[in-house]
């Protein structure tokens, strides 16, 4: 094959008058009788190829025989187009073909290769190699590649060492479920795929590699949603002899380079810092969207003595009353639309939603009759009311109130269009609690992980009241999504033991699971700290996508399966016997059903499409 001159999408006026060799896919063919136009597509874009009667009868026949998605080689001369297409990068020129070689024909694809398609997601994933030909996905995958390039360049410039950590490790029952890999050599024992390289990278600090980074593949067996996949990539870093500021400086430098190299945006540093308490009380979230205001306001002082028992009763029971004001919401939201929000926040355990409108100097709505003149003046002052606002209020336990208003705030912001487009707003959330209470588990868990260093006061509290301790941890948030998180790590055995004890570990369990770590901490372990950024989520947001699948070449669907290769799938009985696994009877019918379905699909495919002559 002859060497390609350039990508089809890069053939601009600078090539005018030159002979070129191009390769790509046929996007579209238009036969006008004496002229045939071919849109030739590759990863960089589309260029128009023209074949006319002067090109010869054979070339005209080849051009006329082409179908969409045929793979071709084109040779020809770059000439000016008679009519410029300003919508195309290549719109000033076209290629006057002298030779076309059909490298492979294509059957009619199950969906058209273009950005706007109506194909079902399952179909797109089954034919993912076709889906990935669409320009929007190619741009997203290329953007992800540019992020990776920037990461490698930055850490190399800063003297970090790229070290791979094991994929096959030991299972830990903490956190999400592990993906388990059975051992053939040790029947009944299992490896676990890593949920993160956390302990390995800490051990590397103990080994003296004071600046580590890795693009780490991680695995979590958890329920999926738009911003999660069972396998994902972390931009992982760890350093020795640095405090929080040092790690944050490196992180800001990395983000600055990514934003410049990938988005051509100059990120302003230092990035703003707010405490966890401020984030929760002002935004209702530890992942605050700081692109817009609509802050939460504490109305407890206004209503603590109110005759409206929904408010004063909640406060008396140790709860709070908070609210947000939606500008112009008085006209935009009818009673019916507001009541729909009541059902929405019940999922966050809120008992109800109180609301009032402020128009023409008057309050109206269900709770207006309970407002004293003093209440009204206080609300006007608290929210700086100008007129036209809708005020929504939740009274309940602090966590219920903040969760409910956080989600209402986000929903109102989207509905009223106050979120600025094309803005990437970063913020550090610092000074986290060391522990948080998990209602589902009914116990305290680590807010980040069990290896996070408490602050100085928190170290003392580990012995007396650990759940009041604060952590030396920090999250980097962008546009209301957590991009990454990190912390100062525990580097002394005594503190690590206290941490495990506070989490409810017995000494036996702690040493069975993490004895190697505690032994290491006694061997001259340095102070160390680190951070991990979710590459997939960062790429998704920079690409303007709503789902991580759009920045992942071969993702799983919402059921954690992969329709193209049919993974996961049953395996041969002998393979199971080799690793000492037997499928329980209750699952045998399901496995057999899956095997039969896959066999049938394979046979139908072979019967319909195969050229194999047995």
Curated annotation (Swiss-Prot):
<dbReference type="GO" id="GO:0005737">
    <property type="term" value="C:cytoplasm"/>
</dbReference>
<keyword id="KW-0547">Nucleotide-binding</keyword>
<feature type="binding site">
    <location>
        <position position="220"/>
    </location>
    <ligand>
        <name>L-aspartate</name>
    </ligand>
</feature>
<comment type="subunit">
    <text>Homodimer.</text>
</comment>
<dbReference type="GO" id="GO:0003676">
    <property type="term" value="F:nucleic acid binding"/>
</dbReference>
<feature type="binding site">
    <location>
        <begin position="534"/>
        <end position="537"/>
    </location>
    <ligand>
        <name>ATP</name>
    </ligand>
</feature>
<feature type="binding site">
    <location>
        <position position="489"/>
    </location>
    <ligand>
        <name>L-aspartate</name>
    </ligand>
</feature>
<feature type="binding site">
    <location>
        <position position="482"/>
    </location>
    <ligand>
        <name>ATP</name>
    </ligand>
</feature>
<dbReference type="InterPro" id="IPR012340">
    <property type="entry name" value="NA-bd_OB-fold"/>
</dbReference>
<comment type="function">
    <text>Catalyzes the attachment of L-aspartate to tRNA(Asp) in a two-step reaction: L-aspartate is first activated by ATP to form Asp-AMP and then transferred to the acceptor end of tRNA(Asp).</text>
</comment>
<comment type="similarity">
    <text>Belongs to the class-II aminoacyl-tRNA synthetase family. Type 1 subfamily.</text>
</comment>
<keyword id="KW-0436">Ligase</keyword>
<feature type="binding site">
    <location>
        <position position="174"/>
    </location>
    <ligand>
        <name>L-aspartate</name>
    </ligand>
</feature>
<dbReference type="InterPro" id="IPR004365">
    <property type="entry name" value="NA-bd_OB_tRNA"/>
</dbReference>
<protein>
    <recommendedName>
        <fullName>Aspartate--tRNA ligase</fullName>
        <ecNumber>6.1.1.12</ecNumber>
    </recommendedName>
</protein>
<keyword id="KW-0030">Aminoacyl-tRNA synthetase</keyword>
<keyword id="KW-0067">ATP-binding</keyword>
<dbReference type="Pfam" id="PF00152">
    <property type="entry name" value="tRNA-synt_2"/>
</dbReference>
<dbReference type="InterPro" id="IPR002312">
    <property type="entry name" value="Asp/Asn-tRNA-synth_IIb"/>
</dbReference>
<dbReference type="GO" id="GO:0004815">
    <property type="term" value="F:aspartate-tRNA ligase activity"/>
</dbReference>
<feature type="binding site">
    <location>
        <position position="229"/>
    </location>
    <ligand>
        <name>ATP</name>
    </ligand>
</feature>
<dbReference type="InterPro" id="IPR047089">
    <property type="entry name" value="Asp-tRNA-ligase_1_N"/>
</dbReference>
<dbReference type="InterPro" id="IPR004524">
    <property type="entry name" value="Asp-tRNA-ligase_1"/>
</dbReference>
<dbReference type="InterPro" id="IPR047090">
    <property type="entry name" value="AspRS_core"/>
</dbReference>
<dbReference type="GO" id="GO:0005524">
    <property type="term" value="F:ATP binding"/>
</dbReference>
<dbReference type="Pfam" id="PF01336">
    <property type="entry name" value="tRNA_anti-codon"/>
</dbReference>
<feature type="binding site">
    <location>
        <position position="448"/>
    </location>
    <ligand>
        <name>L-aspartate</name>
    </ligand>
</feature>
<feature type="region of interest" description="Aspartate">
    <location>
        <begin position="198"/>
        <end position="201"/>
    </location>
</feature>
<keyword id="KW-0648">Protein biosynthesis</keyword>
<feature type="region of interest" description="Disordered">
    <location>
        <begin position="587"/>
        <end position="614"/>
    </location>
</feature>
<dbReference type="GO" id="GO:0016740">
    <property type="term" value="F:transferase activity"/>
</dbReference>
<dbReference type="Pfam" id="PF02938">
    <property type="entry name" value="GAD"/>
</dbReference>
<keyword id="KW-0963">Cytoplasm</keyword>
<dbReference type="InterPro" id="IPR045864">
    <property type="entry name" value="aa-tRNA-synth_II/BPL/LPL"/>
</dbReference>
<dbReference type="InterPro" id="IPR004364">
    <property type="entry name" value="Aa-tRNA-synt_II"/>
</dbReference>
<dbReference type="GO" id="GO:0140096">
    <property type="term" value="F:catalytic activity, acting on a protein"/>
</dbReference>
<dbReference type="InterPro" id="IPR004115">
    <property type="entry name" value="GAD-like_sf"/>
</dbReference>
<feature type="binding site">
    <location>
        <begin position="220"/>
        <end position="222"/>
    </location>
    <ligand>
        <name>ATP</name>
    </ligand>
</feature>
<dbReference type="InterPro" id="IPR029351">
    <property type="entry name" value="GAD_dom"/>
</dbReference>
<dbReference type="GO" id="GO:0006422">
    <property type="term" value="P:aspartyl-tRNA aminoacylation"/>
</dbReference>
<dbReference type="InterPro" id="IPR006195">
    <property type="entry name" value="aa-tRNA-synth_II"/>
</dbReference>
